[in-house]
Amino acid sequence: KILLSYIGVVLFLTGCGVYSFTGVAITAETISIKNFYNDADGGPPDMAQTFTNQLTDYFQRNTNLTQVEEKGELQIEGVVTNYRLTPVAPTATGTDDVGDAAALTRLTITVSVSYVNTTDENFSFENKTFSFFEDFDNELNITAIEADLLTRIFDQIILDIFNATVANW
């Protein structure tokens, strides 16, 4: 009876492993993230640098990869290709002489990314597009809320890039 209990405990413990909630099982040890550049019309002048910094910080916080300037086992580079403000959620003004107005404006950011995985080329990709948007009240001044909007949009795009590269989702 003690032997059966011992075998049960051993089987239970061997079933327990170290699991990652991000799904990251990385064999590489180094990563190089080149500075993204801005090819979008509009947006703040430091938008691409801000994106690069947030991306680098995210990989630092969520992996054990050592960041190197170039020739990492994993390599990421890209460009911010689109910064677009679009009116959404039209509302009627109630007068004939004034056209309908938008209650919300949508800020959309698009990034094109190339990724090289030197440990397994099957995971590499070139010029993959990642995009996300945030809507905001049309009454608000974009310059007053732009930094916050960019942070939230970048957070989602970076999560998508992370999942497409090292998390393999």
PLM regions and their residue ranges:
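A structural "domain/chain start" motif
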Residues: T14-Q60, N64, E69-G72, T119, ...
